[in-house]
Amino acid sequence: MAENGESSGPPRPSRGPAAAQGSAAAPAEPKIIKVTVKTPKEKEEFAVPENSSVQQFKEAISKRFKSQTDQLVLIFAGKILKDQDTLIQHGIHDGLTVHLVIKSQNRPQGQSTQPSNAAGTNTTSASTPRSNSTPISTNSNPFGLGSLGGLAGLSSLGLSSTNFSELQSQMQQQLMASPEMMIQIMENPFVQSMLSNPDLMRQLIMANPQMQQLIQRNPEISHLLNNPDIMRQTLEIARNPAMMQEMMRNQDLALSNLESIPGGYNALRRMYTDIQEPMLNAAQEQFGGNPFASVGSSSSSGEGTQPSRTENRDPLPNPWAPPPATQSSATTSTTTSTGSGSGNSSSNATGNTVAAANYVASIFSTPGMQSLLQQITENPQLIQNMLSAPYMRSMMQSLSQNPDLAAQMMLNSPLFTANPQLQEQMRPQLPAFLQQMQNPDTLSAMSNPRAMQALMQIQQGLQTLATEAPGLIPSFTPGVGVGVLGTAIGPVGPVTPIGPIGPIVPFTPIGPIGPIGPTGPAAPPGSTGSGGPTGPTVSSAAPSETTSPTSESGPNQQFIQQMVQALAGANAPQLPNPEVRFQQQLEQLNAMGFLNREANLQALIATGGDINAAIERLLGSQPS
């Protein structure tokens, strides 16, 4: 028995090492877990070992999303996962969701270091620089704004494409650069009615994919949204822009003084790392980069790394102060000084016109605007989807029926805010433009890439003529009419098919700067659209002398203005009489004590029906 015991003893120790080997082999073949990786637009499921590192997890994700590992940012439970950590350390188990943000590579240094990766990623690195050359990545729509904040039923607008994302980003940047426009939007009755409905706002917020991710990472936010008192207080603050601005200033001041408190600097760093940095990284492709990136790079380079030990008593600058118009004023002064030899009044008018032309030309000659026009030309499906949607038609119809709203939108645009001269010349053309936008021929021409290309060629040709042959375009004077267009270019007949494209001209750098802009509404009733000199000669008898000085400085603007007036003559019978159109405003002005009906009508025509601007105009014209 002893021998048997001894003989049976050795197998037991032999099983011990086998068991030890089995236990040692268990970590080598760990449990496979399924983790869902969710981006703002899609989600994928990955099967990875439980003890995988974040770097290994990123390598698996990069193959599926065709991106480099250094572009991937993984967020779980409100924290950014570091490459050296493992999934177990962060508590990532089977069935959980990890959020992914794909960063864009804007710096060429990052692209030059990509070929040093593995051979499996070299193929993607060869293809990613081409796609990353665009400002907006096709995988990026972090806030779900392609579908208008997650609103259902608006996908037919075609707003999820890359080109519209770039257009949307530019509009958002202009909106953020114009706080007055943001305030007026918040004070809009429609927006106020939306903010007064907590249930509707809660539904809109919960429908936003970005807010859904934020709620998943921070469940306490859902409790705030479900609290009616907090929602009511928040919406009351949102309805009061002045209160919101004051709260923002107080918060900025409190954060600036937080550094002087012991431990405050670390709290600021932790808040930035855990909250602000993930949100900014998620939004950087939409808004053009992290606005604090330069601050971080400068602080890491040497200066400003030590926290402040004293209280900051310097007043904060006013972030809502309008930017100084030094460049525009300098341009105006130089242009007026160059034309001072021909008289004071004519030189001022010439200087203002040239300054307005330079202002608009500088905007439309920017690479971003040229790229946008090129993308619109190359992507007719986007324009067709937008213009054929019933929402766009109803919006254009409502704007044409409410010229006050259209004029207010134009005045609030950053393009016109800093240039009153451009505002005065665009107001008379606005009703004709809105009605032309409802013309089916105009909509079909805008969705036709060849028609858009022809329009761009016309614009480029006019600019070339104005530069190379300035003596040719002065022949198109206001008194001659558009009949010269037929003799100089060809028969009058081929001019009429271009009529639907006429409203696009105000978007060109030289379109809105016609010197006879205020007479636009008076010209269409006399013109028949046939190209004869009948229409323009009615309103050009007197202005022919006053606009002669500007014909030398901007003859191409006169030519474009004549085209716009002639092409708008086709829809002239649809325009109501100004007295009928502004009947309500005239009655209000009469009740206020402005008894001169003719002066009131002229003020309303000049201001596009804006009664507040008309009152200011009437008060300014009265002798003091």
Swiss-Prot record:
Sequence repeat start-end pairs: 491-493, 494-496, 497-499, 500-502, 503-505, 506-508, 509-511, 512-514, 515-517, 518-520, 521-523, 524-526
Extent of Low complexity compositional bias: 15-32, 116-141, 294-304, 326-349, 535-553
Keywords: Acetylation, Amyotrophic lateral sclerosis, Autophagy, Cytoplasm, Cytoplasmic vesicle, Disease variant, Membrane, Neurodegeneration, Nucleus, Repeat
Maturation and modification: Degraded during macroautophagy.
Annotated Ubiquitin-like domain residues: 33-107
Gene: UBQLN2
Biased composition (Polar residues): 106-115
Species for this entry: Homo sapiens (Human)
Protein name: Ubiquilin-2
Subunit structure and binding partners: Homodimer. Forms heterodimer with UBQLN1. Binds UBE3A and BTRC. Interacts with the 19S proteasome subunit. Interacts with C9orf72. Interacts with HNRNPA1 and HNRNPU. Found in a complex with UBQLN1 and MAP1LC3A/B/C. Interacts with EPS15, EPN1 and EPN2. Interacts with HERPUD1. Interacts with RAD23A. Interacts with TARDBP. Interacts (via C-terminus) with FAF2 (via N-terminus). Interacts with UBQLN4. Binds CD47.
Domain notes: The ubiquitin-like domain is essential for its inhibitory effect on GPCR endocytosis. Mediates its association with the subunits of the proteasome.
Intrachain disulfide bonds: none
Protein origin, superkingdom: Eukaryota
Effect of residue 189 to T: In ALS15; uncertain significance
GO biological process, one term: positive regulation of ERAD pathway
Keyword Membrane: yes
Keyword Transit peptide: no
Residues modified as N-acetylalanine: 2
Residues covered by the STI1 domain: 178-206, 208-247, 379-426, 430-462
